[in-house]
């Protein structure tokens, strides 16, 4: 279905913010930075295969890059994609690893 190589390129990093932390605590939702070309189906397959959890749904959005200036020069940061992955009841992703 989805190759090992594509899994590693689809998921970039977990997105940590105040809103993402609140969503994780209340709605069993994990937020990831993903490749701009990634589809919802690819994101779902990558999370299920990599973390061995069941995904209920995936919501995505493209965050527009900010305009930044340094002196007289103006530039723009790249656009990036964010995915809200809602896990099924009883499922959890442990990023820190289980300490024994």
From Swiss-Prot:
Entry function: One of the early assembly proteins it binds 23S rRNA. One of the proteins that surrounds the polypeptide exit tunnel on the outside of the ribosome. Forms the main docking site for trigger factor binding to the ribosome.
Protein known as: Large ribosomal subunit protein uL23
Keyword rRNA-binding: yes
Similarity-based family: Belongs to the universal ribosomal protein uL23 family.
Record note on quaternary structure: Part of the 50S ribosomal subunit. Contacts protein L29, and trigger factor when it is bound to the ribosome.
Organism for this UniProt entry: Photobacterium profundum (strain SS9)
GO MF term list: rRNA binding; structural constituent of ribosome
Pfam annotation, one family: Ribosomal_L23
Keyword Ribonucleoprotein: yes
Family matches, as SUPFAM superfamilies: Ribosomal proteins S24e, L23 and L15e
Residue pairs linked by disulfide bridges in the UniProt entry: none
